[in-house]
Amino acid sequence: MAQLKITQTKSYIGSKQNHRDTLRSLGLKGINTQVVKEDRPEFRGMVHTVRHLVTVEEVD
């Protein structure tokens, strides 16, 4: 199954609280932190919520 490599590229300062909570739920704690998650609808939805703060790459 494919996986997603999610990298936080921008700071959450000034963002809404739900965006901060979503970043924390994804495991992102600061700029340039990366996590690898399974490619599932739950994670796709979280990434969509904070798409302006992160970059996403598909990893095999």
Curated annotation (Swiss-Prot):
Signal peptide start and end residues? none
Family the UniProt entry places it in: Belongs to the universal ribosomal protein uL30 family.
User: Under what name is this protein listed?
Assistant: Large ribosomal subunit protein uL30
PROSITE patterns listed in its UniProt record? RIBOSOMAL_L30
Q: Please tell me the species this chain comes from.
A: Streptomyces avermitilis (strain ATCC 31267 / DSM 46492 / JCM 5070 / NBRC 14893 / NCIMB 12804 / NRRL 8165 / MA-4680)
GO-annotated cellular components: cytosolic large ribosomal subunit
Question: Tell me, what is an example of a GO biological process annotation in this record?
Answer: translation
Q: Which HAMAP family is this protein grouped with?
A: Ribosomal_uL30_B
